[in-house]
Amino acid sequence: MGALTKAEMAERLYEELGLNKREAKELVELFFEEIRQALEHNEQVKLSGFGNFDLRDKRQRPGRNPKTGEEIPITARRVVTFRPGQKLKARVEAYAGTKP
């Protein structure tokens, strides 16, 4: 199983919508840049029928160096999380054949 790349997304836009290759690539880049900028400005990104990107603050916590076993602090940080929407979950479950 492979991974979908931005180049493949641009190629699909080229094939399906008739955009030229440069326009298709720019559209994909602009889409992801909008998501990045929203997250940089502490905004939630809601993509209807797909899911939400959120920022979450993680507190400092104790960790351990796996080589030495020494306890070291893991610093507080902000992370991006993705929560899939119900429609996306349903499609993935139906495709995977694991729908309850």
UniProtKB/Swiss-Prot annotation:
InterPro entries xref list = Hist_DNA-bd (IPR000119), Histone-like_DNA-bd_CS (IPR020816), IHF-like_DNA-bd_dom_sf (IPR010992), IHF_alpha (IPR005684)
For this protein, the record's SMART domains field holds: BHL
The UniProt keyword set, sorted, is: DNA recombination, DNA-binding, Transcription, Transcription regulation, Translation regulation
List the GO cellular component terms.
Answer: cytosol
- Tell me yes or no: is Mitochondrion among this UniProt entry's keywords: no
GO-annotated biological processes: DNA recombination; positive regulation of metabolic process; regulation of DNA-templated transcription; regulation of translation
Q: Please list where the region (Disordered) is annotated.
A: 53-72
Q: Which residues cross the membrane?
A: none
* Role of this protein: This protein is one of the two subunits of integration host factor, a specific DNA-binding protein that functions in genetic recombination as well as in transcriptional and translational control.
- How does the annotation summarize its subunit structure? Heterodimer of an alpha and a beta chain.
Name of the featured protein? Integration host factor subunit alpha
As recorded in Swiss-Prot or TrEMBL, the protein's gene is named: ihfA
